[in-house]
């Protein structure tokens, strides 16, 4: 069941609800709360047993939240909540029946001078007003004696969101709201506050990222198939002309540290680069060349779990309760592994990605999705916290930021404390595959934008939603993330997804989506090979998109390559695309038209995802003819 125990004021959300979740205890050794707030992942919201029930209290923004429980790895809805729905998120291939919690305060209209309701970015101040769905007919911002009409930006299950944007304002701002509601005139305010700026380094906003999985990218003996394909950091260094030549000025590397797998998400040694990838020497030489070229670098940090073969975990396996590292992991009992487990391991009967094992080959520890190779770290341990801080700080002497793997499987407060110990220039993004609000603002500057990816899939790839519905999803992300939206890492695909080109089956539609990615708010990123039309395979699990890079240029799609370079050049040379406001002009059917503008610069982006010609109107009375599955970007100035 769930219960709400009032609200607490919050400088980001205005207020948060105290929500208690509980479920009967039935002999499980552990339990976790799962939900749309942590992408239904174990690890982040561990429950406490009191008597005959598991309990946890969390602070949640108002709205509708989907949730369930993990009882020693067993997924279970709330048996005491009859409100159930099928929750589907194509972005991380989740579709299950889950429980639904509604969290809402008493007021029909709400505003607070907090970060998500009053913020400054790019020389502009944004005002946001929230109302119960259907309550407000219109709303007006009263500012300095002027009436400014507010635009209805988005709606969700409970609320309508209204917004207004004005030029930058100095010092405290005095303002109020007027309007018409279903019950007559309404008035809210006055308020007096200083608009809030998000604390984050500015350099990421001017970047276009290129993501590389080193084993699959370049090397002296790169193979087209197999587990280990032979790519390394020496090969990557030799191919920087290709990356820089297209205009990419930031690089994201998947894990490069010592591990037993090609992908590196089972780290054995956090302080040394994998010898298979060229070791520390290759990394140092790569960093020198990146700095010479002005290319920023972020690394992939795996701190939800380690490898089974990490020395700390091996010490626990050998010494059991006497190990000094027993508190490093979520150990459930002793011995940590059975004798039959060790025999199966030594005889090669336990492949690293298995979730099952021969009869009797048991293990007594929590792990990433029940994979024995990846034992879960104990995020409550102060030793683990200091270890993570030390590792991240060590590599930030050479790198410029971190992407944190399975960030939604670690408590949000853990990342808040980590960020406090990092240099202010470091760009920190988390892998949060659903609603990321609990992880943004205080913890991460941005997240891998799975919320946007979900909307992109449904509109561009699957055609499940109309342009009007697509716009609503865009604006919901915007009101929920506020200025942090500009720091989101936006993508069409990555190492955990299928290649976008494989999903859309059409080069023209792929380029339409790429044009949107490069001209929308947030930081655009391209997965290696997308620029040449590299294909993967559908239904291939996590390996679906991890095709080795093709370096024979006769195999490249020149049309995609040239358009990618042109879009990157446009992005890097446009402050409007990096910092500018977003103004929807036309979102109808399969056509979207919007303006990005700042100061004296204005670009209009028109994208036709339909199979017919479309004529659209532009500001200033001009019109534009768009062929099927095409886009145009027009410099309209001011």
Residue spans of the language-model regions?
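Substrate-binding/active-site clefts of carbohydrate-active enzymes
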Residues: 213-249, 256-396, 417-421, 438-439
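Hydrophobic faces of well-ordered beta-strands that scaffold small-molecule active sites
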Residues: 208-210, 251-253, 297-299, 402, ...
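Short edge beta-strand/loop segments characteristic of extracellular beta-sandwich folds
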Residues: 18-24, 124-132, 605-607
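C-terminal beta-strand-rich structural cap/linker in extracellular carbohydrate-active enzymes
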Residues: 624-638
């Amino acid at each position: 069941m769930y219960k709400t125990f009032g609200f607490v004021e919050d400088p980001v959300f205005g207020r948060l609800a105290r929500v208690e979740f509980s479920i009967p205890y039935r002999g499980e050794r552990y339990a976790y709360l799962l939900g749309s707030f942590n992408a239904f992942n174990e690890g982040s919201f561990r429950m406490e047993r009191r008597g005959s029930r598991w309990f946890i209290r969390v602070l949640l923004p108002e709205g509708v939240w989907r949730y369930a429980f993990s009882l020693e790895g067993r997924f279970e809805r709330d048996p005491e909540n009859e409100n159930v729905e099928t929750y589907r998120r194509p972005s991380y291939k989740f579709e299950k029946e889950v429980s639904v919690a509604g969290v809402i305060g008493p007021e029909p209209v709400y505003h607070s001078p907090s970060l998500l309701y009053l913020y400054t970015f790019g020389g502009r101040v944004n005002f946001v007003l929230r109302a119960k769905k259907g309550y407000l007919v219109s709303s007006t911002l009263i500012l300095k004696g002027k009436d400014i009409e507010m635009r209805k930006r988005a709606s969700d299950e409970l609320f309508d969101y209204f917004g207004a944007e004005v030029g930058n304002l100095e010092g405290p701002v005095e303002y109020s709201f007027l309007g018409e509601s279903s019950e007559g005139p309404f008035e809210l305010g006055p308020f007096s506050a200083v608009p809030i700026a998000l604390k984050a380094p500015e350099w990421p906003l001017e970047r276009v990222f290129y993501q590389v999985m080193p084993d699959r990218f370049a090397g002296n003996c790169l193979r087209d198939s197999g587990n280990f394909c032979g790519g390394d950091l020496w090969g990557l260094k030799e191919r920087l002309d290709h990356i820089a030549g297209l205009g990419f000025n930031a690089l994201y590397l998947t894990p490069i540290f010592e591990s037993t797998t090609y992908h590196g998400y089972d780290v054995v040694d956090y302080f040394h680069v994998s010898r298979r990838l060229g070791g520390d020497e290759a990394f140092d030489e790569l960093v020198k060349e990146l700095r010479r070229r002005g290319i920023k670098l972020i690394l992939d940090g795996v701190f939800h779990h380690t490898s089974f073969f990490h020395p700390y975990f091996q010490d626990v396996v050998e010494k059991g309760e006497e190990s000094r590292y027993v508190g490093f992991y979520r150990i459930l009992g002793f011995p940590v592994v059975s004798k039959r487990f060790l025999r199966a391991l030594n005889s090669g009967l336990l492949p690293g990605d298995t979730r099952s094992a021969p009869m009797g080959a048991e293990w007594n520890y929590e792990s990433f999705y029940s994979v024995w190779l990846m034992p879960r770290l104990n995020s409550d341990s102060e030793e683990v916290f200091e270890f993570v801080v030390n590792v991240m700080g060590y590599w930030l002497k050479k790198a410029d930021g971190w992407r944190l793997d399975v960030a939604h499987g670690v408590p949000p407060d853990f990342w808040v404390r980590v960020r406090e110990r990092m240099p202010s220039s470091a760009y920190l993004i988390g892998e949060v595959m659903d609603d990321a609000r609990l992880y943004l603002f205080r913890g991460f500057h941005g997240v891998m934008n799975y919320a946007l990816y979900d909307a992109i899939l449904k509109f561009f790839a699957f055609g499940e939603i109309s342009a009007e519905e697509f716009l609503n999803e865009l604006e919901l992300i915007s009101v929920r993330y506020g200025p942090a939206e500009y720091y989101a890492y936006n993508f069409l695909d990555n190492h955990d997804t299928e290649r976008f080109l494989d999903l859309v089956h059409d080069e023209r539609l792929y380029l339409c989506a790429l044009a949107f990615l490069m001209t929308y708010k947030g930081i655009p990123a391209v997965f290696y090979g997308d620029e040449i039309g590299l294909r993967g395979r559908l239904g291939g699990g996590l390996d679906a998109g991890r095709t080795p890079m093709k370096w024979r240029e006769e195999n490249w799609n020149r049309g995609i390559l040239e358009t990618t370079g042109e879009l990157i050049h446009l992005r890097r040379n446009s402050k409007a695309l990096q910092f500018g406001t977003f103004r929807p002009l036309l979102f109808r059917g399969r056509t979207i038209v919007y303006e990005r503008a700042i100061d004296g610069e204005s670009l209009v982006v028109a994208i036709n995802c339909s199979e017919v010609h479309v004529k659209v109107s532009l500001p200033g009375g001009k019109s534009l003819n768009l062929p099927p599955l095409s886009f145009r970007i027009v410099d309209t100035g001011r």
